[in-house]
């Protein structure tokens, strides 16, 4: 009998220099509450240590298939908690609902928020 492995999770890259903090999140599969229990404390710690620095966020949702119910709630809480933390937020996706979500989210965020279909364009915008 074959074993089925469910691929899901969140990849994180955190880069920092003297003036800027850059966080990149890659979402894969259907996210769970446990995924958020792992990654949220990492982001919280990075933001706390970088207080006063310009902070940008890149979120790649191209391989995201959705959230379990509790994970969707975790995502909402994360967004509300950190709505003032980022100067720029670039979201990479390919679905219309993702683009519409970014448009709605932009009204809640302090910084600039923009949707992209291509990673290169998102990075270019963040680096301006």
Whereabouts are the PLM-identified features?
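Amphipathic, Lys/Arg-enriched alpha-helical "gate/interface" segment within cytosolic domains
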Residues: 2-128
